[in-house]
């Protein structure tokens, strides 16, 4: 009976081990994990014939004008600056001078045009001012003459009032005279004499 139990245990252990061992399909490696170490058919690149490398080699090396301003340098005073080519600097200065000269010529041309226009405007303003002055003088004379006319009208009204008051008095005086001193004049003659007197007085006033 013990032999049977041991036989059964061995049979169960073999069955369990057979069930635990994974199948070869589960241990199949993925394509990403495969590394090929064999030499391929592609030929090696020659860096000497590479166009990108050739272009990089054609770029000249250069340094900044002020090497001391670089962040990696701690003592810029010890760095010796490279000298610039005087011919190129002179050419740069000459071109800049030509540019400034052209700008100055353009500004001078515009300035001359503005000055000419300002002179023309000054002449126009002066001519207009002279015309306005002459017109103002003419109107001042007209105003003075109108003032004289107003004064003359007032004088004539006063003279007319004086004549109107004088004629009845002269008539009364003429009627009161005796016959020996009677000097009867027509009223038209008396009025005409007074008008002539007033006219002469007005001419003296206007002169």
From Swiss-Prot:
Please state the protein's primary subcellular location: membrane
UniProt region (Disordered), positions on chain: 1-24
InterPro entries (alphabetical)? TBORCS5
Name any one Pfam family assigned in the record.
Answer: LOH1CR12
Protein family membership: Belongs to the BORCS5 family.
Sorted alphabetically, the Gene Ontology cellular component annotations on this record are: BORC complex; cytoplasmic side of lysosomal membrane; membrane; synaptic vesicle membrane
Query: In which compartments does the protein localize?
Result: Lysosome membrane
Q: What does this protein do?
A: As part of a BORC-like complex may play a role in lysosomes movement and localization at the cell periphery. Associated with the cytosolic face of lysosomes, this complex may couple lysosomes to microtubule plus-end-directed kinesin motor.
Topology relative to the membrane: Lipid-anchor
Q: What name does UniProt use for this protein?
A: BLOC-1-related complex subunit 5
CDD domains (alphabetical): BORCS5-like (cd22789)
Q: Which species does this protein come from? A: Danio rerio
Q: Name one GO biological process term.
A: organelle transport along microtubule
Q: Which UniProt keywords apply?
A: Lipoprotein, Lysosome, Membrane
């Amino acid at each position: 009976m013990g032999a049977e139990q041991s036989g059964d245990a061995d049979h169960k252990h073999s069955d369990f081990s057979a069930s635990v061992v994974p199948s070869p399909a589960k241990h199949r490696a993925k394509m990403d994990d495969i590394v090929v170490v064999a030499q391929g058919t592609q030929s090696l690149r020659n860096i000497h014939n590479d166009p990108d490398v050739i272009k990089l080699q054609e770029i000249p090396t250069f340094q900044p004008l002020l090497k001391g301003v670089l962040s990696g340098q701690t003592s810029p005073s010890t760095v010796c600056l490279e000298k610039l080519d005087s011919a190129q600097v002179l050419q740069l200065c000459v071109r800049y001078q030509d540019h400034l000269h052209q700008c100055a010529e353009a500004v001078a041309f515009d300035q001359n045009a503005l000055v000419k226009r300002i002179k023309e405007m000054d002449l126009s303003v002066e001519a207009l001012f002279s015309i306005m002055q002459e017109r103002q003088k003419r109107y001042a004379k007209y105003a003075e003459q109108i003032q004289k006319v107003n004064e003359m009208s007032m004088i004539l009204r006063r003279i007319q009032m004086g004549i109107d008051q004088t004629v009845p008095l002269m008539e009364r005086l003429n009627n009161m005279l005796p016959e020996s001193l009677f000097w009867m004049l027509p009223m038209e003659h008396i009025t005409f004499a007074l008008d002539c007197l007033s006219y002469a007085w007005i001419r003296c006033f206007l002169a």
